[in-house]
Amino acid sequence: MHPEFAPVAFLSAASLALPLPWHWRAGNVATLSIIAWLFIMNMIYGINAVIWAGSARITAVVYCDITTKLTIGGNFALPAACLCLCIHLERVASVRAAQTTAADKRRRTIFELAMCWLLPIIFMALHYVVQGHRFDIVEDFGCRPATYYSIPAIFIVWVPPLTMAAASLVYASLAIRHFMHRRLSFAMHLQARSSALTTSRYLRLILMAIVQLVWLVVTTAYTLWFSSMTLNLRPWTTWADVHSNFGRIQTWPAIITPAVILRGACTLWWMVPASTWIFVAFFAFGNDAVEEYKRVLNVVLSGARRALPEGFLSEKKRDLKGFSLPSFVKGSVPLGDSSSSTRKDSLPDKAVLPVNRSVTMTTTTSTVVSSMPPPYSLPPPPPPQKYTSPLDSLDYSADADRISISSSVDTSGYTIEILPETPSTSSSTPPSPSSPQYPRSPSSQGSHVVDDYYYTSSPQDSLPHDIPAPPSLPPPTHMPDEAHISPSHAVPSRPPAFPPYPFARDMRPAASEPMSPRPITYPSMSPTHRDIASVFPGGRR
């Protein structure tokens, strides 16, 4: 008993439907023929395993007449289809034809149909020449074709499949040689030939053909060896002698059949499902097959949705009225409850969520309290400073003190004096007298106020109104040392960015270098430089 025969055969036949859609759209007659013949043989083996499970009774005679001939045809059709496939792949990889025309496709289709279907029919008819009786019935295996084992039978039944397998291996070798010769530009070569093949499809086809051919050679050789071991080579005498008592049906019950014959029959039976699995393994797991599976699944799901009664999904939604969230969400609102609303009083007091940080959400106040630090906020800006003179608007530093201009100051020499810092009434945070950013030195004119550039003025000529200060700027980063500042001449921290001066750079004052040829690019109030500055275009008089 072999209870596994029927399910294995039927599953093998069903697995051929996986790569079928892609090959059907490609219109490859050779691969479609392989699928068709493997499907036929698997169905025959499965039906035989069901009918003759544990028995060898004579039944379904007409069915056996048909299936035995189809089995003979399948032994020829599979190597013929592999030969057609290898011929096509070798022609695609070669450079004998630049492009494939419609006439070439039509001739190829006719040739493949003749090789895959007409030639097996011819050999099915030729098998009648070496058919000694009607058929055999083996227990658990069903009906099998009967062959008069002789020299003509070897050349009719076994030699043609071996010859086609050898020719297929030659064409497959040439195809691989062409591929290796132009493997770097093979994809462009396939595109230039207007072929539907890609490099991956080409490799899968050629590898499948080679593996199938090797397997068919092994199968045919084993069948020939098994027949020679179990049957004696008989001489071909006459037609009448060979076909005498032709309507006889030979039965082989398991109890009287030699064990070697049963083992050989079991081995030959498993070769057909193995050939099917080899073919499916090469094409059922590629990108094309996966895309086809997705498309079929979408079609099935869309059909299932259309088959559902109208309003089925809405009824399911109404059934969720009493459904609540999982247990880790506390205080949740039941779904589908029409009485719930977005008002604060209808929401739960507190909801605990499964997060990494300890977060507590209070819905009544719409605030979130977490362990994270509070967001940074900028401090409020200081109140604007007020100036008593229009010249204060030219001050570079926003933290400069108030300035007043006096008419009693010697404007010809621009005497600059440094006075102690006077607290500003307009600044909210007056600078410290000891601050290093604003160096000061004592002055004889205590009523004078010094700005950031150490120009002095008296409050007599100050304007009666105040001018708001410009936006606050950061304090200067560099100030001169105390040793370089004298009461008679003070050095500004950096030159002002006045429009008349093209650029500003950090240099020593021109007073220290009177013969310097450099243009004066900063306001020099020294009397010795007054006439010198008028000569240079960058100077200021």
From Swiss-Prot:
Spell out which residues lie on the membrane's Cytoplasmic side.
25-33, 91-109, 172-205, 286-541
Q: Name one GO cellular component term.
A: plasma membrane
Q: Where are the transmembrane segments?
A: 4-24, 34-54, 70-90, 110-130, 151-171, 206-226, 265-285
What keyword terms does UniProt attach to this protein? G-protein coupled receptor, Membrane, Pheromone response, Receptor, Transducer, Transmembrane, Transmembrane helix
- Coiled coil segments of this chain: none
Task: Indicate yes or no for the key word 4Fe-4S.
Answer: no
- UniProt KW Methyltransferase keyword: no
Q: Which GO terms describe its biological process?
A: pheromone-dependent signal transduction involved in conjugation with cellular fusion
- Which PANTHER family does the entry mention? PHEROMONE A FACTOR RECEPTOR
Q: What does this protein do?
A: Receptor for the BBP1 pheromone, a prenylated mating factor.
The family note in this entry says: Belongs to the G-protein coupled receptor 4 family.
Q: State the name under which the record lists this protein.
A: Pheromone B beta 1 receptor
According to its UniProt entry, this protein's organism is Schizophyllum commune (Split gill fungus)
Upper lineage is:
Eukaryota, Fungi, Dikarya, Basidiomycota, Agaricomycotina
